Each structure stands twice: as structure tokens, then as C-alpha cells.
Amino acid sequence: MGNKLFVLDLGEIRVDENFIIANSTFVTPQKPTVSSRLIDIPVSAYLIQCTDATVLYDTGCHPECMGTNGRWPAQSQLNAPYIGASECNLPERLRQLGLSPDDISTVVLSHLHNDHAGCVEYFGKSRLIAHEDEFATAVRYFATGDHSSPYIVKDIEAWLATPRNWDLVGRDERERELAPGVNLLNFGTGHASGMLGLAVRLEKQPGFLLVSDACYTATNYGPPARRAGVLHDTIGYDRTVSHIRQYAESRSLTVLFGHDREQFASLIKSTDGFYE
């Protein structure tokens, strides 16, 4: 039995396009009043069913992230609001597949921002894989009560309220096999302090390279590559995009970007089928 990959649609976030593609719009003496553009970008997770493991890549936003008593700070809700019906939250998407969080053996967290690690608290029985530098960054924001970043203090408080099986990837560990045909990749610093990807081999096609926000869209990917508007480390980001290209092309893998509207619309969603 080969691997199966399910694409989970977890709603959307509405953002200024400049967040995704740096300098998408800018004023000039000839055009002094150019307006920014709002776009809706997909929030996603990926479920890989293997012979002896069930691996989840990312967890989306917390179902209660928005509203007066929402997890997200008011400014985050204003700047980049989450949009999604109840069927788009992660526990519900798993239920639609006949699964619960307890059925997931391993959760790989590409990074710990609000739209990727919002549902960590549901996975009390799973191994949670995160980059050690990313974990340290998230905990620092929590410990200092800093609400100014995409690391959500209320989410992190819930993660740390009970013991969990954290597996932190060190800076020097470049790649690790999680299951036959499923490899964890350490992209290092770039969009965030520590980014992780997942290479998934399939039987009926070469497979996919899941890169999350290490590269937002095909426009960022290029060539020529274009930087995102939200970056922790520009040099690390450039290096990561180059590494992603080399890795994917040498293995004939299709890169699945973090927030590409056109690409995501073209994918088979978990409600309609899977890739194998």
C-alpha cells in the first residue's frame, strides 16, 4: 500500500498583497496615489496516510481565533482576518475523513505562526515536530506577553498547559525519514526562525514537496524569485528558495506553496479525493 496525500482546505486569510509579494504596489512621482490590493489567500494542511503512520503537515488557525473573545489580538484580526465556515476548521476536516486528532501519529509544524499552528492543542497524543529555533521564538513571545507578532500568546498558552510529545529539529539536522517515502526537510531560517518542509513520494506520480511559507506562491518562486513581504531573514529566505528548487527538480517533485490561490484552487481537496 502506497502513500495517500489529502489536501485540507482550512479557509482563507484576507491580506494586503504586499504581505505576499514584496513591493507589489508602490507609489512613484508619476503615480503618487496607487492603492494597495486586498487578496484572500488559502489556509491549508496536508494529511499523509502511510502504511504504518498518519502524518499531518500544519494545523491551520484555531476555530476561535476571531471575534471579541477570539484568540488573536484585535490588531491581528483587523490586519489579516480569518475567513472560514465551521466545516473548514481542522478537527472538522479530520472528522470528514473518519479521523480524530488522536489518530494522527505525527504532526509536522512548518513553523509556529497563527495560521499554521493554531490547532496544536488538539494533538495531545501525537508527536509534534518543530524546529528548535522556531519553538524558542514562539515561547519567548509567550513568556514576554508580546502580542505584536504572528505567534499567538493564547495558542501557545494552551500548548504549554499540558505535557506534549515535542520533537525539536536541531539546526544541523538537514533531512529525516518519517516513513517510507515521507521525508522531513529542515529549511532553516527565512520566513520565520525555523522552517520545515515535507517531501512526499507517491506510487502513481512522483509526488510533492510541501514548503508552506518558505515560499508563498509561484510568483515568489520564479524564476526570477521574488521576496515575500513578511520575512525574518532575507538571506535565509533566498537560500531556502534556491534549495527548494534544486531539491524538487532533482527528484521531479511538484512544489506545493504556502498560500498560492491559483495553485490551491487546482488541487483535489480532501472532500473530493486524494493523491496516491
Curated annotation (Swiss-Prot):
Q: Name the keywords, alphabetized.
A: Hydrolase, Metal-binding, Plasmid, Zinc
Q: What general EC class does the enzyme of this chain belong to?
A: hydrolase
Q: Where does Zn(2+) 2 bind?
A: H116, D213, H259
Q: Which cofactor does it need?
A: Zn(2+)
Q: Which InterPro entries match?
A: MBL_superfamily_lactonases, Metallo-B-lactamas, RibonucZ/Hydroxyglut_hydro
Supply the EC number(s). Answer: 3.1.1.81
- Gene Ontology MF terms: acyl-L-homoserine-lactone lactonohydrolase activity; metal ion binding
A UniProt-annotated Pfam family: Lactamase_B
Q: How is the cofactor bound?
A: Binds 2 Zn(2+) ions per subunit.
Q: Which reaction does it catalyse?
A: an N-acyl-L-homoserine lactone + H2O = an N-acyl-L-homoserine + H(+)
> What residues does Zn(2+) 1 bind to?
H111, H113, H191, D213
Coiled-coil stretches are none
Family of the protein in this entry: Belongs to the metallo-beta-lactamase superfamily.
Return the protein name: N-acyl homoserine lactonase AiiB
Species lineage: Bacteria, Pseudomonadati, Pseudomonadota, Alphaproteobacteria, Hyphomicrobiales
